[in-house]
Amino acid sequence: MEPDVIPAKNLVFGSGPECPTELLCLPLLRARYGLTFKEFRVTDAGGPRTVDALEAGEIQVGVLFTTDPRLLAGDFVLLEDDRHAQPAESVTPILRDELRAAHGEHLAASIDALSAELTTERLAELNRRVLLGASAAAVAAEFLTKRRHGLTPPTPRRNQPAIVVGSANFAESVTVAELYAHALAGAGFLVERRLGIGNRDTYFPLLRDGTVGLVPEYVGSLLAYLDGSRGSISDPPQAHAVLAQALQGTGLVALQPAPAQNKNGIVVTASTAAHYGLTKISDLGRAIGEPDGNG
C-alpha cells in the first residue's frame, strides 16, 4: 500500500438519509476530524441496513450506537472518538424531586448503586439478550440478582406514594426502566410501571406533570431537548453538572449518571480496521505510515 493513502478517501460511509446535514454525523466528522469520504450511501441510522451494508462491503464505515449488541461479537471495530467530538450521552435517571422528598435519600441511593454498575458493555449485553427474545423484566431481574442491588431484606415503606417508572418506546429505555423498577421494588418501595410511552415529546411532559415519577434519560439528548445550545458537551461530569443546573426550578432532579453511554459510534469491519490499521477516528484521516502524534 502506498504510504500516502488516506483511508477515508478510499472508503464509503453509510448512515441514515439525514447524516449529510445532521450536525452530529458527517458535518461533525468534517469539522472535528477533517474527514472526506469517497462516497456517502444511504442506509439507516444505526440499524440493520447499516449492518448489512458493512457486512456486504457496500460501505466500509458506518454509524452504530455504542450500546448496540452487535459490537460485542468482534465483527466490527468501534473507533475511539479521540477528539471527543460526540456529546456525552450518559444514561441518567431523572426523578421528580417531590418523590425524593417523600421517600428520603434511600430512594436515590438505591438507584445510584444500580447506575454505578451499568457500563456501556453491560448495557450492550442486556440489549443483546432482549434482542434474542428475553423479556426486559427477566433480563433486569437477573442483572440485579447477580449484583444484589435492592435484594437484601427490604425495609417496609408504608403510607408512601407509589413510584411510577416510565420509559420511552424503544427496547433499551424499557430495559433500563425495568432495572430501576426492580431495584426500587427490591428495596421495599411500591412501584408502578408505565413503559413504552413514546418519544421524548410524549413522555417528558408526563414526567413534568407528575404522571410519571422516574425515567431513564441520556444526558446530551436531554440537554439538547431542554436547551439546544448546551447539548454538545463531551465530558460526562460537566454535562451532568450543566443538566442539574438546567433542571433547577422544574421539579426534576438528575440522579447520578451511569458509566454507560449510548451515543453515535463510528464503526468499521474488523477486516477494514486491520487493513488500514484503524483504532481511532483520526486514523481515517491519517496517511498510512504517518505518525499519529501520540508518541
Predicted regions and their residues:
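A conserved helix-loop-strand patch within extracytoplasmic ligand-binding domains
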Residues: 1-12, 96-100, 115-120, 237-295
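Ligand-binding cleft/hinge of the Venus flytrap
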Residues: 2-40, 142, 180-188, 281-295
